Swiss-Prot record:
Ubl conjugation is among the record's keywords: no
Cofactor: how and how many bound: Binds 1 zinc ion.
Organism, scientific name: Aeromonas salmonicida (strain A449)
CMP/dCMP-type deaminase domain: residues covered: 47-166, 186-293
UniProt-listed Enzyme Commission number(s): 3.5.4.5
UniProt protein name: Cytidine deaminase
Length: 293
């Protein structure tokens, strides 16, 4: 078990702690399958929403917030019934625009896990405007429920007179299936193959700047991030930030990155190269490998 979970575990009820311990092993992927959720519910007698609220301290324990010291946890409920952790992440000494919000982290975790939408997101603090706009891009934005410790409301109640993809004549949505098979790269290198697969699944209907990052760690594990674009532009989540956030959720130390690659479309209106290099430099790790295809 990752040591970050020790303290929040001690705040949980004995039945919940006992049921969780076998699940929080070194292979924990910051998610609970429907079968694991059923086990936790049976052990505690808690219903879905109450159980997610009880688990929030574990999600918040994944937060990396050296600037704000404000630790936010989120749990996204995928349409498959799997629950996905998320936590905010900041980069020490770097511009705040590099930051990943907890809701973005949880949604990215679900998207990378193969989900095509989420039905509910549970968070320990009310979502900021940035996150509300990010969630309004989702395939399930019209029906998404936001669960807080003292409230359960539809996302749309947080966004009166909202702006979204339809205002820019876009019928696609974040987390809807993507297949940008026009991106082609001949390589037998597993890290580049992973980046290519992720880029083909990225979401960039406004710039066509389909892109993905793949990070290889010292222990041999590989984590990818896809570009997630937004109708309001600024809430878009770059692939480097998504890859870093996912790796941290799964217990990696970003100081142990051994290779980092960025693959993007050569036909996009934008490039992720400078942004990715800047983030990587902040980590003091490796040089960015790059290909536009």
């Amino acid at each position: 078990m990752h040591p970050r979970f020790a303290k929040p575990l001690d705040t949980l009820s004995a039945p919940l702690k006992a049921a969780l311990l076998p699940m929080l092993d070194n292979d924990f992927q910051a998610r609970f399958t429907p079968q694991q959720v059923a086990t936790l519910k049976a052990a505690t007698g808690l219903e879905d929403r109450a159980l997610r609220l009880a688990l929030l301290p574990l999600a918040a324990a994944c937060s990396v917030a050296p600037i704000s010291k404000f630790f936010v946890g989120a749990i996204a409920c995928g349409l498959s019934g799997t629950w996905y952790f998320g936590a905010n992440m900041e980069f020490a000494g770097q511009g705040l625009f590099h930051s990943v919000h907890a809701e973005q982290s949880a949604i990215s975790n679900a998207w990378l896990g193969g989900e095509t939408g989420i039905s509910e997101i549970t968070v320990n603090y009310t979502p900021c405007g940035h996150c509300r706009q990010f969630m309004n891009e989702l395939s399930t934005a019209k029906t998404l429920q936001v669960s807080l410790p003292d409230d359960l409301s539809a996302l749309q109640s947080f966004l009166p007179h909202s702006f979204g993809p339809a205002d820019l004549d876009i019928t696609d949505a974040l987390m809807s299936p993507q297949a940008h098979d026009e991106l082609v790269l001949e390589s037998e290198d597993p890290i580049w193959r992973a980046a290519l697969a992720a880029a083909r699944q990225s979401y960039a209907p406004y710039s066509q700047g389909y892109a993905a990052v793949a990070l290889l760690f010292a222990d041999g594990r590989l984590f990818c991030g896809r570009y997630a674009e937004n109708a309001a532009f600024n809430p878009s989540l770059p692939p480097m930030q998504m890859a870093c956030a996912h790796a941290v959720l799964c217990g990696e130390d970003l100081a142990s990155i051994r290779r980092a690659v960025l693959l993007e479309s050569k036909n996009g209106q934008i490039s992720q190269r400078d942004s990715a290099q800047s983030t990587l430099k902040a980590l003091g790790s490796v040089e960015l490998e790059y290909q536009a295809v």
